[in-house]
Amino acid sequence: SPPHRPGIPHRGRQLLRQAFQPGHVLLPKVAQQQRCLRALGAGFREQDEKLVVCGAAGDAADAPTMDCGESGSTLRFMMPIALAVGQGGTFVMHGRLAERPLEPYDPIFEACGVTRTREGNTLTLRGKLKAGDYTLPGNVSSQFVTGMLYALPLLPGDSTLTVTLPVESAGYIDMTLQCLRESGIRVESIGDWQWHIPGE
């Protein structure tokens, strides 16, 4: 289950939910996600020890490079987001991050015609995530579910997301849903671990 006090997982989700929303908000710094979101066109400025998130500052570069450090959550969150707000990009991985599994995304990206190229410690995705009906396994990291829950509301058109049983990290999925709802993004439960997600 997730931590009871706001820690890095909650802060990262706060940053992601605000990055492409209009307006300004103060949030704690989350370095890897800030770098990646800036590459995708989100605007930030620093004030004291926090970030002022200004919302989308412009279009993402055609093929942005996003340094994920050694953070598996950053990589898994940013992959679908980059395909939603742009045409993908190149993800730089450090340490053992390149060994972390990413296969749960494969059927989704293949259905959208997304290409994936791996060279050493870099992974390049090219294409566009599309609204649709998607399924993810629940017996792997909830980070894949979080990535899709953040990306799908950014697309034109409505989507559904289903997580198959058993669901191992339910608390973290609930944390993501709470952050989305606090940001005014509607995610409607239509069944056990199944949601209807309106697009833009």
Question: Residues of each region from the PLM?
Answer:
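Structural preference for solvent-exposed beta-strand-turn elements
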Residues: S1-E200
